[in-house]
Amino acid sequence: MRRLGLSLHHDTSPSFAALACNQRPPPNGTVHACSKSRPPQLEPGKVGKKPIKKTMRIARIPTSIPPHLRLPLDLSAVSPMGSASEHDVREHLLDVDGVGEEGAAAAAGPKIRVRGLTRRSEARGEEILRGVDLDVPRGVVVGVIGPSGSGKSTLLRALNRLWEPAPGAVLLDGVDICGIDVLALRRKVGMLFQLPAMFDGTVADNVRYGPQLQGKKLTDAEVQSLLSLADLDPALCSKPASELSVGQAQRVALARTLANDPEVLLLDEPTSALDPISTQNIEEAIVRLKKTRGLTTVMVSHSVKQIQRIADLVCLLVAGEVVEVLPPSELSEAKHPMARRFLELS
């Protein structure tokens, strides 16, 4: 499929469709086909960046798409279903949700199950992830901490196929995500980055964009409700996105992600560029979404204190391996020396 290049304040040019749901494609701008290998037999196992400038980066993207560009766009990085028929959508949802005994069994298990996930750096040839095993329970916030370069962001990208989870397997509701249509998957698994791009236009234009790709227009009341969920004043609807502060832009991006009604939220250091008040606003929004929507959230952070405030489980990733998974209250009892080091420095 053709891609529409966009000029951002980055060295790469992410696809137009990826930006529609706050997702950035891999550095080479492509999404590789999933491995055909099957996931390993699941057995009970362990449940288991450098500082950035505090400046806002806004992509001036027109909110109206010429008709001749609407369908050919590579929508593989967009959460909405795009132009899929109602029949296709229903089939995808049935495939993901499961039915009968299998569906009930999936509902009883973890929301996300990772087994044997390994990834090697193409540039350096070294392993970024080394056989990661991790279970993410339903309706909880899992905080992922670890030193820079330990594979935290790579793990997040594998959970919705921005990086292909191969070798290894990632299961969503018991289903291998490589067997799920990528558009259906990213509609269910939303992702928010440190500095999301804003579309040119108003705040409401940004929030409406994902559903608009599905042919649905959110009402003013729906947009305002989403802004409230993201801890924003609904009166911001008509404000130009170019005039938003960094903290406001981050929360508008959160509302834009929520407009796709995801079941899982992936957050890659969403508060690293924010002031303390904006950070608190984002944290409160995450907790509220867990309580009101039952969202399963996986959040990468360098702040142990932040994870202790909002997470139900902490996953410590060191050199590409999960070395500890435990409740925040038990971090002081962690056996791995890196966990103790993190606590000493927090």
UniProtKB/Swiss-Prot annotation:
Tissue specificity statement from the Swiss-Prot or TrEMBL entry: Expressed in roots.
PROSITE patterns according to UniProt: ABC_TRANSPORTER_1 (PS00211), ABC_TRANSPORTER_2 (PS50893)
Similarity comment text for this entry: Belongs to the ABC transporter superfamily. ABCI family.
Gene3D superfamilies: P-loop containing nucleotide triphosphate hydrolases
Disruption phenotype: No visible phenotype under normal growth condition, but strong inhibition of root elongation when grown in the presence of Al or on acidic soil.
Protein name from the UniProt record: Protein STAR1
Region Disordered: start-end pairs: 23-48
Keywords from the named record: ATP-binding, Membrane, Nucleotide-binding, Transport
Lineage, uppermost ranks: Eukaryota, Viridiplantae, Streptophyta, Embryophyta, Tracheophyta
GO biological-process terms attached to the record: phosphate ion transmembrane transport; response to aluminum ion; UDP-glucose transmembrane transport
Residue ranges constituting the ABC transporter domain according to the UniProt record: 112-344
Role played: Associates with STAR2 to form a functional transmembrane ABC transporter required for detoxification of aluminum (Al) in roots. Can specifically transport UDP-glucose.
Any one GO cellular component localisation term in the record: vesicle membrane
Any one GO molecular function term: phosphate transmembrane transporter activity
Cell compartments where the protein resides: Membrane
PANTHER family hit by this protein: ABC TRANSPORTER I FAMILY MEMBER 17 (PTHR43423:SF1)
